[in-house]
C-alpha cells in the first residue's frame, strides 16, 4: 500500500486509470494497494482527480434536505448515456455515508423490459417498421421501460418498508432476477438513470439533471467499452434522440450539474 499526502480528508477522488473512487481520508491513512510485482524494480503511476462537483452537489442537497420534513427522500441523477451519472452518484453516496446518513444507490438500468442486447434488437425492429418517429415513441417510454415496477420500489421506500424487492438485470438472456433488499436505516435513495426525469416516474423528491452532449456521451461510451456497438450509426442516433427528450425533461430538475461542474437551480 502507498499512502498519499496533502489530500482533503472529506473529499472523494477518482483514480483515472481504474475508475475506482476513494475518500481522501482512506488514501492518506490506509493508502492505495499496488499490483503484484512482476519484476524486481517496477514503477507505477496513479492519477487522482478530486470530484469537486460531487462535493458541491452534496452541499446543495444537504441545504435542500434541511427544509424537507420527510424521513426518507429519493434523489434522481439523470442525463445522457455516458454523462457521468454513475461516477457522480457513487461519489455522492460516499459523502452521505461519511456523515453517517444511510444511503442506497439504485440503478434504473435494471428496469427496462428487455436485456440490453434484446432491447437494441427491439429498437431496430421499431425503427425499420415505423421509422424515426416510431423509434422516438419507443425510447424512454412505457413500451421500453417497466415504470410500474420501479414506481413500486419508490412507493415502498416512501412508505417506510424495511425490505423491498429489487430487480437485477444482466446482459445475457435469462439474467433477470429479483432480490429482497434490506432498507432499514436507509434515509436517502439515490436513483441514477437516464430516465430519472421522466414524467412516467413517480416518487422522486429531488431530480438532478446532468448536462452533456451526444458527442461527449459517444466518447465516454466508447471509452468504457460496455457494448460492442457503442459507436454504430444507429446507436449514435438513439443517443441523439434520447438527448432531445432529456433537454425537454430538464424542466423537471430541481438542481442542474453543468458541463463545467457548476451546480445550480434552474
Question: Residues of each region from the PLM?
Answer:
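Carbohydrate-binding surface patches
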Residues: 1-9
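C-terminal beta-strand-rich structural cap/linker in extracellular carbohydrate-active enzymes
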Residues: 25-52
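Extreme N-terminal, non-catalytic leader segments
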Residues: 51-76
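Conserved lysine of the Walker
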Residues: 85
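Hydrophobic positions on the alpha1 helix immediately C-terminal to the Walker A/P-loop
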Residues: 88
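Conserved nucleotide-sensing/catalytic segment adjacent to the nucleotide-binding pocket
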Residues: 104, 111-170
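ATP-dependent NMP and nucleoside kinases share a basic, alpha-helical "lid"
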Residues: 175-224
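Small-molecule kinase domains that catalyze NTP-dependent phosphoryl transfer to phosphate-bearing small molecules
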Residues: 226-266
